[in-house]
């Protein structure tokens, strides 16, 4: 079974907001330290940023409004923990996310993915579709 999530699903929107905040950090600093968590839904966006770069609430709201539309923004910013900053001071850094290229799919799963893309093109709204090939 595979799960395909629409591009307008709150999880995908949250990923784009987090990415935009990371981009902003790199505009402000050539070597920022930043970790961002975003939870979005029901007209609210909650953001926690652990970073060496300072963001204004206005900058964050502008990003959220541009990507997700007008909604209430709850933003918390904290400095990176000292032991993490010291651990990441050299060339080698750590993080909890890697680069995801995908997983091998069977021919049936590829066909189902194509169906999901057609559905997303026709209905570009929040939604989740689980394709298990049973129907």
Where are these regions (language model features)?
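A domain-level signal for the structural core that forms small-molecule/cofactor-binding pockets
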Residues: 1-135
């Amino acid at each position: 079974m595979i799960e395909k999530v629409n591009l307008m699903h709150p999880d995908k929107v949250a990923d784009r907001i987090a990415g935009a905040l990371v981009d902003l950090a790199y505009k402000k600093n050539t070597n920022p330290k930043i970790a961002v968590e975003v939870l979005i839904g029901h007209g609210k966006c909650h953001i926690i940023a652990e970073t060496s770069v300072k963001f204004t609430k206005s900058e964050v709201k502008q990003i959220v409004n541009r990507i997700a539309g007008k909604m209430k923004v709850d933003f918390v910013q904290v400095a990176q923990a000292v032991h993490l900053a010291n651990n990441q001071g050299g060339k080698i850094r750590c993080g909890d996310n890697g680069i995801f290229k995908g997983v091998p799919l069977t021919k049936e799963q590829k066909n189902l993915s194509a169906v999901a893309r057609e559905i997303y093109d026709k209905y570009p709204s929040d939604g989740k579709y689980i394709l298990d090939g049973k129907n």
